[in-house]
C-alpha cells in the first residue's frame, strides 16, 4: 500500500503572468524548480491564496533567474498577476518511506526570490 504525501511546495509565490492562449500548465523559473525538486511535466496543485481557487496542472520550465510564475491556458482564468499562490507536489510512498521523507519547502518573497528552504520535520 502507498499513501500520497507532500513531496515539495513553493509557498506564497507571486503570479507574474497569466497566459490564456498557451496550451496549459504553470511556467516556473528553472532555479525554483530545482530547489523544489520539481520536474518538467510533473503534476502540481495550485492554491490561490487571494481567491481560494484550488486546481491541478503540470510544470514547464521557465528561464532561470527570471522568477517567472505564469499560469497558462484555462488555469489563467483562475489567477491574476500579483496573486499569491502555493505550488504543491505530492508523491506516493509506503508508510515506512513517509516516516523518514522530508519534503522540500521553499518560502519566497514578493519577487519570488527564495528567503528560506526548509523541510517539514516528521516524527518516526
Swiss-Prot record:
Q: Which Pfam families match?
A: Asp_decarbox (PF02261)
Gene Ontology biological-process annotations: alanine biosynthetic process; pantothenate biosynthetic process
Compartments where found: Cytoplasm
Any GO MF annotation of the entry: aspartate 1-decarboxylase activity
Q: Which CDD domains match?
A: Asp_decarbox
Kindly list the positions annotated as binding substrate: 57, 73-75
The alphabetized UniProt keywords are:
Autocatalytic cleavage, Cytoplasm, Decarboxylase, Lyase, Pantothenate biosynthesis, Pyruvate, Schiff base, Zymogen
The family this protein is said to belong to? Belongs to the PanD family.
Coding gene?
panD
GO cellular component, alphabetical, reads: cytosol
UniProt superkingdom = Bacteria
Name of the protein in its database record: Aspartate 1-decarboxylase
Which taxonomic lineage is given here?
Bacteria, Pseudomonadati, Campylobacterota, Epsilonproteobacteria, Nautiliales
The species is Nautilia profundicola (strain ATCC BAA-1463 / DSM 18972 / AmH)
Q: What is its main location?
A: cytoplasm
